[in-house]
Regions:
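Short gly/pro/ser/thr-enriched loop/turn and capping motifs at secondary-structure boundaries
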Residues: 75-77, 176, 198-203
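Conserved beta-alpha
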Residues: 76, 80-159, 163
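Proline-aspartate-enriched helix->loop->beta-strand connector
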Residues: 160, 164-174
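A transmembrane-helix-recognition feature enriched in membrane-embedded lipid enzymes
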Residues: 74-77, 81, 209-251
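N-terminal nucleotide/polyanion-binding subdomain common to many enzyme families
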Residues: 1-91
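A short, gly/pro- and small-residue-rich
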Residues: 56, 60-64, 178-197
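Short, flexible loop segments at boundaries between secondary-structure elements
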Residues: 142-148, 189-226
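A short helix->loop->beta-strand "cap" motif at the edges of active sites that frequently abuts
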Residues: 36-38, 109, 188-191
C-alpha cells in the first residue's frame, strides 16, 4: 500500500487532507498494484463525526482507517477553517465510485458489491454494464439486515476471494459499513470502500440532490425532505452534534 497522506482531526475523526484528484489517484494506485494486505477506505461526513463523538469504539475504528476522505461539504468547510494551509476538497463517495468505474486505466480491476437490496443490486449491475462497459463486475451480495453469523462471514469472505475481486464496494449504511470495510481489509488482500448511498444513486433508485445544493451544504435538506422518517435523527440530531464535536476538538 502506498504511504497515506497525513491526517488532521476534524471533530472526533482524523481525515486525509487531499483534493478529489489526489484521492482518486491514490485509490487508482492501490487498485493497479497487487496487494499483500487489505486497505480500508472511508468516505465520512458530519453524521460519521456525530456518531464517533458518542461512540468511542466507532471513533477508534474510523481513526484506524487507512484513508478517511471528506465526503460532506460541511466537513470540508471545517477543514479549511481549522487547517487553512492544507488541501481540502469534497471527496464524495458516489463521484469517486463513478470515476473509478469509468476510468479506462482501471479496466483490469475486478469489482464486487456488498449491501443494499437484491432489486437495487440488480439495477446497479445493469446500469454499470450500460454506462461503464469496461468495468468488470465479478460478484455482488445482498446480506440480511440482521447481524451475520461467523459462518456467514466466512462464507462471504470465501465468495469474495473466489471471485478474484480487487475492490469491494460496501453500502450497508453508517456505521455498519465502516465496521465491515475494516473487517474485510483485515481478512482479505483487497481494497474495501464504504460508499453509503452510492448504490442507490448509481442504480437510479434514489435521486441525488441538485449540484447547487451539494456545493452549498444543503444536500441534507433535500434528503430529509424526501425521507423524513428514516433520516430525521441523522440530521436533526447529527448536525448539532457535528458542530459541537468540531468546536470541542478544534486544535
Amino acid at each position: 500500500m502506498p504511504a497515506a497522506p497525513p491526517k488532521f482531526r476534524i471533530g472526533s475523526i482524523d481525515f486525509t487532507a487531499v483534493t478529489f484528484a489526489e484521492a482518486t489517484q491514490a485509490i487508482a494506485t492501490l487498485l493497479k498494484n497487487p496487494q499483500t494486505s487489505g486497505t480500508s477506505v472511508h468516505f465520512a461526513n458530519a453524521y460519521n463525526i456525530a456518531l464517533a463523538e458518542q461512540d468511542l469504539r466507532y471513533q477508534r475504528l474510523m481513526n484506524n482507517g487507512d484513508f478517511v476522505f471528506t465526503d460532506g461539504t460541511p466537513v470540508v468547510w471545517a477543514g479549511k477553517k481549522l487547517y487553512p494551509t492544507e488541501s481540502w476538497e469534497r471527496v464524495y463517495g458516489p463521484d469517486a465510485t463513478e470515476w473509478i468505474l469509468g476510468n479506462p486505466d482501471l479496466k483490469d480491476v475486478k469489482h464486487y458489491f456488498l449491501g443494499s437490496t437484491e432489486e437495487t443490486l440488480n439495477k446497479l449491475v445493469a446500469e454499470i454494464a450500460q454506462r461503464f462497459p469496461t468495468a468488470q463486475v465479478v460478484g455482488w451480495d445482498c446480506p440480511p439486515f440482521r447481524e451475520p453469523t461467523e459462518t456467514e462471514l466466512l462464507d462471504r469472505d470465501l465468495r469474495i476471494k473466489e471471485s478474484g475481486a480487487t475492490v469491494v464496494w460496501v453500502g450497508l449504511g453508517t456505521p455498519k459499513q465502516d465496521y465491515e470495510v475494516q473487517r474485510l481489509a483485515k481478512s482479505l488482500p483487497i481494497t474495501a470502500m464504504a460508499v453509503g448511498a452510492a448504490f442507490d444513486f448509481l442504480a437510479n433508485t434514489v435521486p441525488q440532490a441538485p449540484k447547487w445544493m451539494q456545493k452549498s451544504g444543503l444536500e441534507w435538506t433535500y434528503r430529509l425532505a424526501r425521507e423524513p422518517k428514516r433520516l430525521a435523527n441523522r440530521y436533526l440530531w447529527g448536525n448539532p452534534q457535528f458542530i459541537r464535536s468540531v468546536v470541542k476538538h478544534r486544535p
